[in-house]
């Protein structure tokens, strides 16, 4: 498996590149528009084809790079079905799976940071977007955020899980 955690200093956003390495297909979670060329170069360096890009929620603190990545790579843009975004090809529901070669990511509706926040569980890795941060949680004071919803949306995870970002 190929796994890269990338960090944008300006927006403090974590982006993830994931591939099984077998079929050379990849997906990216929470891309930042200013780093799209960096992602494209990394994909070339690793000999990967981007087929899916996921936004965990609509971001208020930065512009997503998903549409630009779609324009460059022809990948599919994915978000949870609670999103009001109209530029999404695939909308996933809570407990639905996204497949990439032999990798499965389970979509989990995790409102709280925003009303359209989703997290994605891959084996024991939870990609929580901005719901959980290093040493804290995401803000809940905009985009219909709610601190109680944020807590309740993640407390039910019972299996041992590595939370991203870490």
Regions found by a protein language model. Give the residues of each.
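Active-site glycine-rich loop that binds ribose-phosphate moieties when present
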Residues: 146-153
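Single conserved hydrophobic/aromatic residue that forms the stacking wall/gate
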Residues: 155-166
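Active-site HxH/HxHxD metal-binding segment of metal-dependent hydrolases
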Residues: 12, 23-24, 33-109
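Residue-level signal for the nucleotide or nucleotide-sugar donor/cofactor binding architecture
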Residues: 64, 144-145
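A short acidic, helix-capping loop that chelates divalent metal ions and anchors anionic groups
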Residues: 25, 86-88, 135-143
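Active-site metal-binding loops of divalent metal-dependent hydrolases
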Residues: 31, 58, 82-83, 113-114, ...
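Conserved beta-strand hairpin/beta-sheet module of binuclear metal-dependent hydrolase folds
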Residues: 1-49, 119-129, 135
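Core dinuclear metal-dependent hydrolase active-site scaffold
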Residues: 17, 97-125
């Amino acid at each position: 498996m190929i796994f890269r955690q990338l960090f944008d200093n300006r927006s403090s956003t974590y982006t993830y590149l994931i591939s099984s390495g077998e079929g050379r297909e990849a997906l990216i979670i929470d891309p930042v528009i200013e780093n799209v060329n960096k992602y494209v170069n990394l994909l070339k360096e690793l000999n990967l084809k981007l087929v899916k890009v996921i936004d965990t929620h609509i971001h208020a603190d930065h512009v997503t790079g998903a549409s630009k990545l779609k324009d460059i790579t022809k990948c599919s843009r994915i978000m949870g079905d609670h999103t009001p975004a109209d530029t999404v090809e695939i909308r996933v529901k809570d407990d639905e799976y996204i497949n990439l070669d032999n990798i499965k990511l389970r979509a989990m509706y995790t409102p709280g940071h925003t009303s359209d926040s989703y997290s994605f569980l891959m084996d024991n890795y939870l990609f929580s977007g901005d719901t959980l941060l290093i040493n804290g949680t995401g803000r809940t004071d905009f985009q219909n955020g709610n601190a109680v919803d944020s807590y309740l949306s993640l407390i039910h995870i019972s299996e041992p899980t590595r939370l991203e970002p870490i």
